[in-house]
Amino acid sequence: WSSAASDVYKRQDFDSLVENKSGLGTAGIVVINKDQDIIKCFARIARFYKHESCGQCTPCREGSGWMWRILERMAKGEASREEVEMLFDVTKQIEGHTICAFGEGSAWPVQGLLRNFKKEIIKRNNFDPLIKSNKDIPYLVDQHLLEKDNAQNKS
């Protein structure tokens, strides 16, 4: 897993979590051990949000369904790079555009998955790690990850 797992040992107050691009939300915490499939766990969370959306506002009603479907494909290793890029865009279309905070709450876990578990997403979906630049997949792949993968492939 990424360094996200070690973040649990950091301070768990609202301000400290915001500094780490995280948050307490409703102060509910989900603990997932390393034996679990992290992508499937996030797909399950997305399914909850899709199911529980009241359907009143379009970004939440449609966006939660989109996120769930893409995460299901991602968990099976069937997602394309374009879908994963679109997934981040969908979260940004939901965030700040819903009647209540439920829609935003559905977007934030997905953003966390994309931010903290990129390597798992790339490996599961057989994305080419030897991409020439960040412009090829701007959000999903960080330059340091590309350099690390390139170094491993040379040895």
Language-model regions, residue ranges each:
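Single conserved hydrophobic/aromatic residue that forms the stacking wall/gate
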Residues: W1-A5, Y9
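Ferredoxin-type iron-sulfur electron-transfer modules in oxidoreductases and energy-metabolism complexes
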Residues: K10-S155
